[in-house]
Amino acid sequence: MSTTLLRTIQLNQFSLLGTSLLRRRRSNNFSVRSCGSQTTTTHEAKQSSPTRVAPKNHKSNQLDEILRDYEAVIGIETHVQLSTLTKAFCSCSNNYGSYPNTSICPVCMGLPGALPVLNSKVVEFGVRLGLALNCDLSLKSKFDRKQYFYPDLPKGYQISQFDIPIASGGYVDVDIPLEFGGGHRRFGITRVHMEEDAGKLLHSDTGDYSQVDLNRAGVPLLEIVSEPDMRSGIEAAEYACEMQRIARYLGVSNGNMQEGSLRCDVNISIRPIGQAEFGTKVEIKNLNAFSAISRAIDFEISRQALLYNQGKADQIVTETRLWEEGAQKTVTMRKKEGLADYRYFPEPDLPEVILTQEYVDSIRASLPELPEAKRRRYEAMGLGMQDVLFLANDVSVAEYFDAVIGKGAEVKLAANWIMSDIAAYLKNEKLSINDIKLTPQELAELIAAIKDGTISGKIGKEILFELLAKGGTVKGMIKAKDLVQITDPAEIEKMVIQVVSENPKQLEQYRSGKTKLQGYFAGQVMKMSKGKANPGLLNKILLEKLNAKD
């Protein structure tokens, strides 16, 4: 029957599978969430009177008192979808957003007789990520079959790694932003293993039917399993952010959560302060943003702590819960499966993965500077932590900044220009730094022109926005528009005398105590000079004339 079902999908590219397995009662329906240009699915299970521990964005004083008695223990499973050209075990293209069921073949559809062939790029990316996370690599690893049934899993099993992952025993260092208390954290990495993704179910708004898209089936993933080292929603969210940064720095994934390229499942339990034994672990899914990770964890901590405090700890069960963004709460999805339910056994159609030390060393030598090393380097340059976190957050911004200072620009000035005016321009125009016309060389030239007094800061900003939009050279624009700053004291003094003599009323008011009128006079001189008068020299001469005794 399954063969017939899957052949139907191949013939009809977006076939509706009208089987009872894909139908859902209204009490156990599937909701559809729009995420960017893609429709993704979330499961909403039957839930009777879910507990709402705290109103949105508010915790009562009573709950705060309860929370002081408990400690959260949090771990995260992060699925990183790899940016390979083809899928993990077949030659189908790995293109996000393709028309449904157009990137499929007998291998990723699980048809009889079709055999998988490992994409070597998946192994390379696994080694790169394992090294970046300070893991020990397995020079000999293998694939296993993780068996379970779900309509988007055509083979009836997932090719994964069970007891011998490609990497294990690592750690990652994370800097917590200053607004959340700051500080440095180190979180352990249990393992990194290779596996394939499942397909995707798209459900009707009514829940009466579901559609299957197998384009994603067989797309390569790396799953990163952390140690249960996190203790708050903020720590967990920052850990997930760091996973995204590392994946992007390495070039193994675009890490776009809205496309499903980075997916996080959170495991959380709480225990009374001082207790060594872990509490009952609950998994949370449907976390589509880093802020959602933090909010979902904070809610779940509150929910479990309240149950503990009420003597209802037995109601905290091992289960999978969903985060409902609209309601700002978690709800039960299903009872959590154990390892035995998956009936792992070695994948018979794939050989062992054998790595040589020479291969590992060559990949290690090709690793770029990673976010943690970049942050420490920027810190050593004298930048504040806020600047460090901003610049190192995006690999493209970091590369641009490095290129600017590589052209001789002063570190702090370059950071200020990128973080203020350029960042504002990018936000307003909805662009990335790779889209702008201003090259690092020209930004360095602009900073130098302001610093050496060739142009004023005000003129510099005007030039900046034109260069961002249209490109060009700083020297060429200064020459073409006659923007060279006036630094001749005699010329500035002449303009000051003229402005003061033309405004006797304002001069009298200034000398009567309204000293704020200095700005008025300075503005008039700037207007006369078309913004080219040196501000420092102008203010010095202006004060002399305004305070002179006639």
Swiss-Prot record:
Its main location: mitochondrion. It comes from the Eukaryota. Gene3D superfamilies: 1.10.10.410. GO terms for biological process: glutaminyl-tRNAGln biosynthesis via transamidation; mitochondrial translation; oxoacid metabolic process. Signal peptide: none annotated. Residues 35-51 have a biased composition (Polar residues). One of its GO terms (cellular component) is chloroplast stroma. One of its GO terms (molecular function) is glutaminyl-tRNA synthase (glutamine-hydrolyzing) activity. The keyword Repeat does not apply. It is found in: Mitochondrion; Plastid, Chloroplast. Allows the formation of correctly charged Gln-tRNA(Gln) through the transamidation of misacylated Glu-tRNA(Gln) in chloroplasts and mitochondria. The reaction takes place in the presence of glutamine and ATP through an activated gamma-phospho-Glu-tRNA(Gln). Subunit of the heterotrimeric GatCAB amidotransferase (AdT) complex, composed of A, B and C subunits. PANTHER family: GLUTAMYL-TRNA GLN AMIDOTRANSFERASE SUBUNIT B MITOCHONDRIAL AND PROKARYOTIC PET112-RELATED (PTHR11659), GLUTAMYL-TRNA(GLN) AMIDOTRANSFERASE SUBUNIT B, MITOCHONDRIAL (PTHR11659:SF0). This protein may be expected to contain an N-terminal transit peptide but none has been predicted. Belongs to the GatB/GatE family. GatB subfamily. This is Glutamyl-tRNA(Gln) amidotransferase subunit B, chloroplastic/mitochondrial. The lineage of its organism: Eukaryota, Viridiplantae, Streptophyta, Embryophyta, Tracheophyta.
